[in-house]
Each structure stands twice: as C-alpha cells, then as structure tokens.
Curated annotation (Swiss-Prot):
This is Small ribosomal subunit protein uS13. Signal peptide: none annotated. Pfam families: Ribosomal_S13 (PF00416). GO terms for molecular function: rRNA binding; structural constituent of ribosome; tRNA binding. The keyword Zinc does not apply. Keywords: Ribonucleoprotein, Ribosomal protein, RNA-binding, rRNA-binding, tRNA-binding. NCBIfam families: uS13_bact. The lineage of its organism: Bacteria, Bacillati, Mycoplasmatota, Mycoplasmoidales, Metamycoplasmataceae. HAMAP family: Ribosomal_uS13 (MF_01315). PANTHER family: 30S RIBOSOMAL PROTEIN S13/40S RIBOSOMAL PROTEIN S18 (PTHR10871), SMALL RIBOSOMAL SUBUNIT PROTEIN US13M (PTHR10871:SF1). Located at the top of the head of the 30S subunit, it contacts several helices of the 16S rRNA. In the 70S ribosome it contacts the 23S rRNA (bridge B1a) and protein L5 of the 50S subunit (bridge B1b), connecting the 2 subunits; these bridges are implicated in subunit movement. Contacts the tRNAs in the A and P-sites. It comes from the Bacteria.
Amino acid sequence: MARILNVEIPNNKRVIISLTYVYGIGRSLSKQILAEANIDENIRVKDLSEEDLTKIRNIASRFTTEGDLRREIQLNIKRLMEIKSYRGIRHRKGLPVRGQVTQKNARTRKGPRKTVAGKKGK
C-alpha cells in the first residue's frame, strides 16, 4: 500500500479513487492533483512509479488535510459558539444548523426521542 499524507491508500484501486481515502481530498481535488502531476486518473496505484508518488505527495501537501483540517473545522465551530451567533447556539443545543424544520423531524441531529411522562387519570 502506498502512503500519502500519513494515510495508507489502497493499491488495487484507481488513483483518483484512492486519493479520496485522505480526509479533505474528494473527487474534484483528486482530479486537480492528478492533472497537475500529469498522471492518468485511470491508472492503478500499484502501477505508479516512486517518482509519480513523490509528485502526488508534494502537490497534496499544499492542501489542508487530515488532522489540520479537522482541527480547523473544530476551531471554527468553537468560535461560532463563543461569539454566540445563531449557528453557534444551534451547535451548542445539538439542533440542525442550516435552517431545517425541527417540529416533526431532525431525529439524526436531536438523537432518540426523550419521552416525557404525561399526567395520569384526569
């Protein structure tokens, strides 16, 4: 298995797909990296030369990926919560952040239903 940005990428898959195993590199960024390195995107990782892998590593290292990207996202969310913006408050309460309706749905974000005991015998 080849190692790019401290991530083992699978040998038997196409390069464009294998690069997406790195957090922060999707299909479009993968395509961009391969175009800049002049490498065919349909070639398998096991067929790449060490020189090609070095090119990919050098180009990919310029982007924010893996731990740095995760840390940056966490700091952005933390900043939103500290300045008490609407989005920060929604993050803090564990509710949907992007304007979704929560009256009936949003179970993924809210978690399982919390049943409230009703009054017995009216």
